[in-house]
Design a protein with these regions (language model features):
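Structural preference for solvent-exposed beta-strand-turn elements
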Residues: 1-235
Length: 235
């Protein structure tokens, strides 16, 4: 099959899809905040919805709106919860330490290939610091106990998602805590994204800004930025 490609410039306005990475983090911060948050998010996907559903299981009231989400923080943290992560590694790795910090007896449900994805060394560090983790079935993971204050350490060369989960968790623990990241840090920009989201909510106090918008996904926007460099006029 022969294809003919004719160069052409583009003009117009483009709405970039929202950053899934930031959406996860802002939903979590909003669920931990002191008052409701209007989260503007032009689009969603199954991973983001998994995080929202897990936060609902932890007591937050999250309402999908035409423009995004309205997040009402949990009035009371439940003693136990079932959290369906679907196939989202971010959801599992972010919320597992949070559940440990809150002292919730949590059962995480997993689908697809998520049960095969690694949790070490996060698993070992959480057990060292007070939690008990077990796999009752091939598709579920149980977390019980409560993380205690103290000095935490994690190998940064495995996954930045472990670090994000611990940053959230340690901000919730009463008492002096610290986190040492050893080795070469993997995907450092994602850690900075977590710190920026927490700063927007003034963590560890988690004061809601009221309204916030999920920024566009830069990896998706790169195509259009490249087009502008080649003569297109897109905004």
């Amino acid at each position: 099959m022969d294809l003919t490609i004719r160069p052409r410039t583009l003009r117009g306005d483009i709405t970039i899809i929202p950053s899934k990475s930031q959406a996860h983090r802002l939903l979590i911060c909003a669920a931990l905040a002191d008052r409701p948050t209007q989260l503007r998010c032009a689009d969603t996907n199954r991973d983001i919805e998994a995080t929202a559903e897990c936060l609902r299981a932890l007591g937050a009231d999250i309402i999908r709106t035409e423009t995004g989400y309205t997040v009402f923080p949990a009035a009371r943290v439940p003693e136990s919860a079932v959290l369906n992560c679907c196939e989202s590694g971010s959801t599992l790795r972010f919320l597992l330490p949070i559940v440990g910090a809150l002292g919730v007896d949590g059962v995480f449900q997993m689908e697809g290939r998520l049960p095969q994805r690694p949790l070490s060394p996060l698993w070992e560090e959480m057990e060292r610091m007070g939690c008990s983790l077990s796999r009752p079935t091939a598709t579920t993971l149980r977390c019980s106990g409560k993380l205690k204050p103290g000095s935490y350490s994690i190998d940064g060369s495995v996954s930045s998602q472990y670090i994000t989960g611990l940053l959230f968790a340690l901000s919730l623990i009463q008492g002096e805590t610290s986190l040492e990241i050893t080795g070469k840090t993997e995907s450092k920009p994602y850690i900075e994204l977590t710190k920026a989201a927490m700063a927007l909510f003034d963590a560890p106090h988690y004061r809601s800004p009221g309204h916030i918008e999920v920024e566009g996904d830069w990896s998706n926007g790169a195509f259009f930025l490249a087009a502008n460099e080649l003569g297109s006029e897109l905004s």
